[in-house]
């Protein structure tokens, strides 16, 4: 069995790790970095870019660059590039393909299985979409685990004794808080809460709006209507936010941001940490509610928590750290890398599933209550939030009208009392119920949540034994046909990427060959005949012409001819040198250099040694 990798598929950055020699190791990407921007771009020529190279060109190509796609997982959102529409699953799969390829290059073997993390507060549709993205990328997703739980694994792997910990996870696009009890290899989630639309992107947006509003006041131009200017604002906002984690003031300088009839316009302003904190204070304060909710659900007080673990890049913001300290009454633990902990935890869980790591038991929970719509549009819960998974629960319902022969089961997820205010996961119909007065038929509805947090629902008429069993597939999930089509397209992209890489390597080799040929001709000088020089120059020119075109076979053929021409010249020169030095072997001559003195000296030394 090959290695199972752990992947943190983040809103702004992603990370991949693996267990090696009993220790989790973060895998660097092809560019040498330990995290990869969750950015995908398409050039006007149709080439696909993923990661740092995609992020780098975003300013000049904003319309064809896709960022923070994770925020749209589990929705019917589509990205249109040229005439093609891409789902969030497809874009996420491109990021996963890049991580998979980097892992394969690092490990030197094919990777086909992974554990992928999701925010603890992700609903069923979002979890299913993440699993589909893995399949499209060519990965068998062995387990979907919650990000705070993964971080707790990373923290607690080498800890002894029982501890109650809180994981406060504020990333680029999502916020989670989970409370766990850990000890003796058991990681039990007691409660979880969060907000799927709160993170560093929102902090950036506050800076963007502040810059754009001030610019509009001064010049009457709204930079948010100019895609290229807006992308420059986004980049500047992100940099300013990062700098203000260590500095108290930062300068935002964007020359030639736009122009009007009066000439070019520039931005050159200072943003203080105090002003930044004023801009984001309500966002940071909104994390307090979920923290208190999780504590309440777990039946704990802040003083009962032994350690508070900060995860996610946004927890580097000083105001966030101060807020956590204020509500918990203790300094947060900073002995864990907030960017890498989730991927490390995923790698640990991957090793557990692969049988490499023993004596670890992970008991996670469902973040939201599950149930069905009943008479009057009421949401009737069958499984309460924070129930340990996997779990299975049943409840008996009956018909609402006389002689009702079918019932529609409307499956929902959420905490609101009315069905319409919760998230619809799906609907299905149980038919064939014998006509009877209302209240007589008995219909057993069973909810089954697997270890991935993905829901399966069945309904059974206890009178006839007739049942209907489905895995929830809401309207935003992909059909099997769509997934297969996307898998095939992903393979095509992989093939295109492979060919592109091969083309670059062939071109680089050809360039290198020209350089070596010209250098060697210069070094050999008059040892080459004029005819040989003409032939080599002719072949060099042929390679140069081939490089100007797009025919890779032509470049390979021209390079091969140049190599052959040089081989002929080299062979003649070395044979000639060998003949003039008493018939020394070609190998010996070549090994000692090209001058007669060197060759003669080598042979002389060998004879001297033999005589001894």
From Swiss-Prot:
Modified residues (Phosphothreonine): 174
Sample GO molecular function, one term: ATP-dependent protein folding chaperone
SUPFAM superfamilies in alphabetical order: Actin-like ATPase domain (SSF53067), Heat shock protein 70kD (HSP70), C-terminal subdomain (SSF100934), Heat shock protein 70kD (HSP70), peptide-binding domain (SSF100920)
Segments for region (Disordered): 578-612
Stored Gene3D superfamilies: 1.20.1270.10, 3.30.420.40, Actin, Chain A, domain 4 (3.90.640.10), Substrate Binding Domain Of DNAk, Chain A, domain 1 (2.60.34.10)
Entry superkingdom: Bacteria
Upregulation: By stress conditions e.g. heat shock.
Signal peptide as annotated in the record: none
Biased composition range(s): Low complexity: 578-596
CDD domains (alphabetical): ASKHA_NBD_HSP70_DnaK-like
Keywords assigned by UniProt, alphabetized: ATP-binding, Chaperone, Nucleotide-binding, Phosphoprotein, Stress response
Known function: Acts as a chaperone.
Record-stated family: Belongs to the heat shock protein 70 family.
Record-given protein name: Chaperone protein DnaK
Organism encoding this protein: Thermoanaerobacter pseudethanolicus (strain ATCC 33223 / 39E)
Lineage: Bacteria, Bacillati, Bacillota, Clostridia, Thermoanaerobacterales
The gene coding this protein: dnaK
């Amino acid at each position: 069995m090959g290695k199972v990798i752990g992947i943190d598929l983040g809103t702004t950055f992603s990370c991949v790790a693996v267990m090696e020699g009993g220790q989790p190791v973060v895998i660097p990407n092809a560019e040498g970095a330990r995290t990869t921007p969750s950015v995908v771009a398409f050039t006007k020529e149709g080439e696909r870019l993923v990661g740092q190279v995609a992020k780098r060109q975003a300013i000049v190509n904003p319309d064809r660059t896709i960022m923070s796609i994770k925020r749209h997982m589990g929705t019917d959102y589509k990205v249109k590039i040229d005439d093609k529409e891409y789902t969030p699953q497809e874009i996420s799969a491109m990021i996963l393909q890049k991580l998979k390829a980097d892992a394969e290059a690092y490990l030197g073997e094919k990777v086909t299985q992974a554990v992928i993390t999701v925010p603890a507060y992700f609903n069923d549709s979002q979890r299913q979409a993440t699993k589909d993205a893995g399949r499209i990328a060519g990965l068998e997703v062995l387990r979907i685990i919650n990000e705070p739980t993964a971080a707790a694994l990373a923290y607690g792997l080498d800890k002894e004794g029982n501890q109650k910990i809180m994981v406060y996870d504020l990333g680029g696009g999502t916020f989670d808080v989970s409370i766990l009890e850990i000890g003796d290899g058991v990681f039990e989630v007691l409660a979880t809460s969060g907000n799927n639309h709160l993170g560093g992107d929102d902090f950036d947006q506050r800076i963007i709006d502040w810059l754009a509003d001030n610019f509009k006041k001064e010049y009457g131009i709204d930079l948010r209507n100019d895609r290229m200017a807006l992308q420059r604002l986004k980049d500047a906002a992100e940099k300013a936010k990062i700098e203000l984690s260590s500095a108290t003031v930062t300068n935002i300088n964007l020359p030639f941001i736009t122009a009007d009839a009066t000439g070019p316009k520039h931005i050159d302003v200072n943003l203080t940490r105090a002003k930044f904190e004023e801009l984001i204070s309500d966002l940071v304060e909104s994390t307090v509610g979920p923290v208190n909710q999780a504590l309440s659900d777990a039946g704990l007080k802040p003083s009962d928590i032994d350690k508070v673990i900060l995860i996610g890049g946004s927890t580097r913001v000083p105001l966030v750290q101060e807020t956590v300290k204020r509500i918990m009454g203790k300094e947060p633990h900073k002995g864990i890398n907030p960017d890498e902990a989730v991927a490390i935890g995923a790698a640990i869980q991957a090793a557990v599933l692969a049988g490499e790591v023993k004596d670890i038991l992970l008991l996670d929970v469902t973040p939201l209550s599950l149930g069905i719509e009943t008479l009057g549009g009421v949401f009737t819960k069958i499984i309460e939030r924070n129930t340990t998974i996997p779990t299975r629960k049943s409840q008996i319902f009956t018909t609402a009208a006389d002689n009702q022969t079918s019932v529609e089961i409307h499956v929902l997820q959420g905490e609101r009392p009315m069905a319409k205010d919760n998230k619809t996961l799906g609907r299905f119909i149980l038919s064939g119920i014998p006509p009877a007065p209302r209240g007589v038929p008995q219909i057993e509805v069973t909810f089954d949540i697997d270890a991935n947090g993905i829901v399966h629902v069945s309904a059974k008429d206890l009178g006839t034994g007739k049942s209907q069993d489905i895995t929830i597939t809401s309207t935003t999930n992909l059909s099997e046909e769509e997934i297969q089509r996307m898998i095939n397209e992903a393979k095509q992209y992989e093939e295109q990427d492979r060919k592109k890489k091969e083309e670059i390597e062939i071109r680089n080799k050809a360039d290198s060959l020209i350089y070596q040929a010209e250098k060697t001709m210069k070094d050999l000088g008059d040892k080459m005949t004029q005819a040989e020089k003409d032939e080599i120059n002719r072949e060099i020119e042929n390679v140069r012409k081939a490089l100007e075109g797009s025919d890779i076979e032509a470049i390979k053929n021209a390079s091969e001819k140049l190599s052959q021409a040089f081989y002929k010249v080299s062979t003649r020169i070395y044979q000639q040198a060998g003949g003039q030095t008493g018939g020394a072997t070609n190998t010996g001559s070549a090994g000692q250099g090209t001058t007669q003195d060197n060759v003669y000296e080598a042979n002389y030394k060998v004879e001297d040694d033999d005589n001894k």
